[in-house]
């Protein structure tokens, strides 16, 4: 009987991508088959996130639950990867001594050796170093699960925003060379993938070495991907406003395969708070870039990230954030109450915003964003949307589902399963809180 692998993933899309690569890697090296049931697994891996304090505590709570499984199956291997592993390797050793393997985001390619080492020595095997881009040279070809796929094009971040742990847990920015990225995407296209989502902690800082030794940026890379037969939709995430260049804006005019949606985290609408965060731009600069995009793509939608209650945030600062949300009309966005991360410059600032005030501000902001989301969805009713059909509806197996360019799930009645993996035009008949209902699928391609 094949041995089983269970992976639980916390955090960002980069972690989701890394987890899929771990499955490919360990299936190749150890013959491990993925399972959705941790109780039947021989190897349990936790791919972690350390952006928020609660996310970090979730790791140790989960490990405590897994300890019971290991007590019943002593040969089970438990591994912790991701950003918490990079930041808290010693703490994991102290708080969860039953963990067998600790590895960082840049060393997941060494996971087979670490597992073998831990199994033979029954001692902790740990590697949280930063060997730059080496991991991509040591991974098997990616497997495919549906018509959409993530592709990591760079790692790390060199911006050192005062609140953020990413430079310390994933290292500074390192870009993959252009040709391996194109080769991976060509492989995905050959396997039936129609949409790629380019990933990086600061993806628009991409500076990859091309075939001729020249350096290409994200705009250049998107133009090359556009020419790969079979790839008809391109996304990327996550971007930084400072490096949202004129060349990248121009791509929205030249490359129709690039979706009319942009996630561009701003964090705050207050110039004073942005300076304290070391974001290195002002609100007016941010708005100016979005206005240029709006002139090129009038139907483009925007989403963002917001941190509420950053040290020193006043009522006026929060009002500035709400004014920005009103001016831009942000679609689905992520918002969080500020939590100090150890080792970051902001952790030395007095956390002087009362928690009740933070909660009130977060509720106000989320209510406004949710209203925007519902308004945008309602305005889509009656329109024709091109969606990529990716499978069956979760609630009704008689329906197929797909996603719009602005990332909304559309369910529609259809028994033609040949549409899965194809683009179709559907008419939006109704808007629900978390999805849309489509009718009359046509023009499959």
From Swiss-Prot:
Annotated PROSITE patterns: MTTASE_N, MTTASE_RADICAL, RADICAL_SAM, TRAM
Binding site for [4Fe-4S] cluster 2: 157, 161, 164
GO molecular-function term, one example from the UniProt record: N6-isopentenyladenosine methylthiotransferase activity
Subcellular location: Cytoplasm
Cofactor binding comment, as recorded: Binds 2 [4Fe-4S] clusters. One cluster is coordinated with 3 cysteines and an exchangeable S-adenosyl-L-methionine.
Catalysis: reaction(s): N(6)-dimethylallyladenosine(37) in tRNA + (sulfur carrier)-SH + AH2 + 2 S-adenosyl-L-methionine = 2-methylsulfanyl-N(6)-dimethylallyladenosine(37) in tRNA + (sulfur carrier)-H + 5'-deoxyadenosine + L-methionine + A + S-adenosyl-L-homocysteine + 2 H(+)
SUPFAM superfamilies per the UniProt record, alphabetical: Radical SAM enzymes
Name the UniProt record assigns to this protein: tRNA-2-methylthio-N(6)-dimethylallyladenosine synthase
């Amino acid at each position: 009987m094949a041995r089983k692998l269970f992976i639980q993933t916390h955090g960002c899309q980069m972690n989701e991508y890394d987890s899929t690569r771990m499955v490919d890697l360990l299936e190749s090296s150890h013959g491990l088959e993925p399972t959705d049931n941790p109780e039947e697994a021989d190897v349990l891996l936790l791919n972690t996130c350390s952006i928020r304090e609660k996310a970090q505590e979730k790791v140790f709570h989960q490990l405590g639950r897994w300890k019971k499984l290991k007590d019943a199956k002593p040969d089970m291997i438990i591994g912790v990867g991701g950003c918490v592993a990079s930041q808290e390797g010693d703490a994991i050793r102290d708080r969860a001594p039953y963990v067998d393997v600790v590895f960082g985001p840049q060393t997941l390619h060494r996971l087979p050796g670490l597992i073998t080492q831990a199994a033979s020595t029954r001692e902790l095997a740990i590697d949280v170093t930063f060997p730059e881009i080496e991991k991509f040279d040591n991974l098997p070809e990616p497997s495919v699960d549906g018509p959409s796929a993530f592709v990591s094009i760079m790692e790390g971040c060199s911006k050192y925003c005062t609140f953020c742990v990413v430079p310390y847990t994933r290292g500074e920015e390192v870009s993959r060379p252009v040709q391996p990225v194109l080769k991976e995407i060509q492989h995905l296209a050959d396997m039936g993938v129609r949409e790629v989502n380019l990933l990086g902690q600061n993806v628009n800082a991409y500076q990859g070495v091309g075939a001729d030794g020249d350096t290409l940026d994200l705009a250049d890379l998107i133009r090359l991907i556009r020419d790969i037969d079979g790839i008809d939709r391109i996304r990327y995430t996550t971007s930084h406003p400072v490096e949202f260049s004129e060349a990248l804006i121009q791509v929205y005019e030249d490359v129709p395969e690039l979706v009319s949606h942009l996630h561009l985290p701003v964090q705050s609408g207050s110039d004073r708070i942005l300076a304290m965060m070391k974001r290195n731009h002002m609100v007016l600069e941010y708005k100016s870039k979005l206005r240029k995009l709006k002139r090129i793509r009038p139907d483009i939608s925007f989403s963002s990230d917001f941190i509420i209650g950053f040290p020193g945030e006043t009522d006026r600062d929060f009002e500035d954030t709400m004014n920005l949300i009103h001016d831009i009309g942000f679609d689905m966005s992520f918002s969080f109450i500020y939590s100090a991360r150890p080792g970051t410059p902001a952790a030395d600032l007095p956390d002087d915003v009362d928690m009740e005030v933070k909660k009130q501000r977060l509720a106000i902001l989320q209510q406004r964003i949710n209203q925007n989301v519902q308004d945008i969805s309602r305005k889509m009713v009656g329109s024709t949307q091109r969606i990529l059909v990716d499978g069956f509806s979760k609630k009704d197996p008689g329906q197929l589902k797909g996603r719009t360019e602005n990332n909304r799930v559309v369910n529609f009645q259809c028994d033609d399963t040949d549409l899965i993996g194809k683009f179709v035009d559907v008419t939006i008949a109704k808007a629900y809180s978390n999805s849309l209902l489509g009718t009359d699928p046509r023009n499959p391609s």
